Amino acid sequence: MLDTRSVIAIVDDDESICRAVKRLLRSAGMEADTFTSGQEFLDFIDAVPWVRVECIVLDMHMPGMNGLEIHERLLQMGNCPPVIFISAEDNPLASEEAFAAGAVDFLRKPVKDHVLIESLHRALKRVERSDVNS
């Protein structure tokens, strides 16, 4: 049996954002995997069951499947870790939609490094609390 590996998933169609966030998380001692589409991320979850996604940094607007659709699919699968939505869109409705869907945070791009790290720490504390309670 394989050991479980825990990661933070970064799902954004902009590869440069994926790389930058992954570097930031590594420098903060966190392990991250990147995905440039929602389908790529969902395929990964199906194919690699020994990886535990502890939190998702999820772009709200991507070609194909948008962030809200990905989040809904995860909820349907019963496998939805905390989600931090990110978006370049300057529309107050976007954050309302994200929180209504169950997001733990909504951050506007460009996201300041310390803001993302603080948001991730809060989300991961939620994961720890739910692990203790289950």
Functional labels for PLM-detected ranges:
Residues 69, 90-105:
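Alpha4 helix (beta4-alpha4-beta5 surface) of REC/receiver domains from two-component response regulators
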